[in-house]
């Protein structure tokens, strides 16, 4: 049964960077070719990055307590690591496999160039989050660092989807085999008690009328993440725009209308 999320008044879908519509959401059949399935799944991954980045960008000016700042910096550092891990898996496994299979070494050249365009700025943000003490934190500096690479990052996240859909010219099963090889390496990177809580807390289960089954994990995984992996850094996950069940929630540090009343 389809469900639609109850979206809070001030939420990450309102920007500054818009959530992407999936090919499935546009009416394409994910069973018609693996390129449609893969492009739809890739949209979900990209959307979790967008939701997380929107969340920290919108909330950062209102985070003033030292403990809250420490959690914000940790959360953002985890986001940087997660984006890095995703793109590293593409650079090391997916892109070379596609180049070899298609006998076209430049098939993903545009995407690789886009990675390079935002990588330096993303790394500087990660370094800032790792080396800055809560006492030295500046929301102005924090936002400016995101602004320095965000246009390139979000252009890439959007541009990669039609590139994947263009792989429809190749046999569906061959593309599935290539992606399966890449997936085998994704879980090798990062800490489960960091990446999993961030990912599960940025998935809107009601997105596009609740028609998606993403992430493709067994039902009990939500409980494992919520009650086990999320415990260690629980303060950081307050910046997630959803709870661990995929329900959108009010951004904690955004002032409400009640807060702003004299």
UniProtKB/Swiss-Prot annotation:
Instruction: Keyword check for Metal-binding, yes or no.
Output: yes
Taxonomy, top ranks, is: Eukaryota, Fungi, Dikarya, Ascomycota, Pezizomycotina
Key words of the record: Metal-binding
* Pfam families per UniProt: Hemerythrin
Q: Which organism is it from?
A: Cryptosporiopsis sp. (strain 8999)
Q: What is known of its domains?
A: The hemerythrin-like domain might act as a cathion-binding domain since it binds iron in haemerythrin, but can bind other metals in related proteins, such as cadmium or magnesium.
Q: Which GO terms describe its molecular function?
A: metal ion binding
- List every stretch annotated Hemerythrin-like: 69-160
Q: In which pathway does it act?
A: Secondary metabolite biosynthesis
Could you tell me what this protein is called? Dimeric xanthone biosynthesis cluster protein R11
Summarize the protein's role.
Part of the gene cluster that mediates the biosynthesis of the dimeric xanthones cryptosporioptides. The pathway begins with the synthesis of atrochrysone thioester by the polyketide synthase dmx-nrPKS. The atrochrysone carboxyl ACP thioesterase dmxR1 then breaks the thioester bond and releases the atrochrysone carboxylic acid from dmx-nrPKS. Atrochrysone carboxylic acid is decarboxylated by the decarboxylase dmxR15, and oxidized by the anthrone oxygenase dmxR16 to yield emodin. Emodin is then reduced to emodin hydroquinone by the oxidoreductase dmxR7.
Q: Which CDD domains does the protein's record reference?
A: Hr-like
């Amino acid at each position: 049964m389809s469900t639609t999320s109850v979206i809070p008044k001030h939420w990450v879908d309102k920007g500054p960077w818009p959530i992407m519509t999936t090919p499935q959401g546009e009416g394409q059949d994910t069973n018609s070719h693996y390129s449609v399935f893969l492009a739809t799944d890739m949209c979900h991954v990209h959307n979790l990055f967008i939701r997380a980045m929107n969340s920290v960008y919108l909330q950062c000016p209102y985070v003033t307590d030292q403990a809250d700042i420490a959690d914000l910096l940790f959360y953002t550092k985890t986001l940087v690591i997660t984006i890095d891990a995703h793109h590293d898996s593409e650079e090391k496994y997916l892109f070379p496999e596609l180049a070899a299979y298609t006998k076209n070494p430049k098939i993903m050249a545009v995407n690789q160039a886009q990675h390079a365009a935002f990588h330096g700025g993303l790394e500087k943000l990660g370094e800032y989050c790792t080396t800055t003490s809560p006492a030295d934190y500046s929301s102005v500096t924090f936002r400016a660092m995101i602004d320095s690479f965000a246009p390139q990052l979000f252009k890439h996240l959007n541009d990669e989807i039609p590139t994947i859909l263009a792989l429809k010219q190749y046999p569906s099963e061959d593309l599935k085999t290539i992606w399966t090889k890449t997936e085998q390496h994704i879980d090798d990177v990062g800490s489960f008690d960091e990446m999993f809580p961030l990912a599960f807390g940025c998935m809107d289960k009601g997105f596009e009328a609740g028609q998606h089954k993403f992430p493709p994990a067994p039902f009990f995984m939500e409980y494992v993440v919520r009650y086990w992996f999320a415990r260690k850094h629980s303060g950081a996950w307050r910046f997630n725009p959803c709870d661990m069940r995929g329900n959108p929630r009010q951004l904690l540090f955004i002032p409400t209308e009640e807060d702003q009343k004299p």
